[in-house]
Amino acid sequence: MGFNIPYTDKKRVVIIGGGFGGLKLAEKLKKSKFQVVLIDKNNYHQFPPLLYQVASSGLEYNEISFPYRKIFQKRKNFYFRLAEVYGVNPKGHTIQTSIGELEYDYLVIAAGTITNFFGNKTIEEQSLPMKTVEEALALRDTLLINLEKATTCTDPDEKQALLNIVVVGGGATGCLLYTSPSPRD
């Protein structure tokens, strides 16, 4: 495998991560003198502020996911590659990825965030985070399965346990999920 990116005399800007920051930078470089390579582990940009809507069945995942190749389909000197980055060699101006090594002139790391459990192992092991489309779908599936089980459950304690939902964290995503209509409404 490899990147299969044509040689050019232009300086190459490699952007790791296609979230808001990476996407905005790629857009700003639209009419620049650079060759731009965007690398992301997903082939789509997701809109995180609406993940709670996917988790609560208000939206489908494709309503908040936008393929990079479609976003940049008419761009010259722009290349998207689906890959995971494993390492950076600043002295050699290269990155190591799941599809090979790539040279760069300028490197921008805009890889996003991960869920921070603040060292709480119980929450880490027992919770369903919601930072990605996949996690929002997993949360939605769990909520719907629990609601279906509760519908046929005859044991009041078991039914209550199935209907209990604990939101950990008071950020925007947790608050929006907590206040959004449930799938049974």
Q: Language-model segments: which ranges?
A:
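N-terminal Rossmann-like dinucleotide/flavin-binding domain of flavoprotein oxidoreductases
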Residues: 3, 28-104
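Cofactor-binding loop segments of dinucleotide-utilizing enzymes, especially the Rossmann-like FAD-
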Residues: 18, 40-41, 170
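Conserved Rossmann-like nucleotide-cofactor binding loop
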Residues: 21, 44, 114, 173
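N-terminal Rossmann-like FAD-binding beta1-loop-alpha1 element of flavoenzymes
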Residues: 13-32, 177
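Conserved small/polar residues in nucleotide/adenosyl-binding loops
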Residues: 179-185
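FAD-binding core/adjacent interface of flavoenzyme oxidoreductases
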Residues: 1-12, 79-166
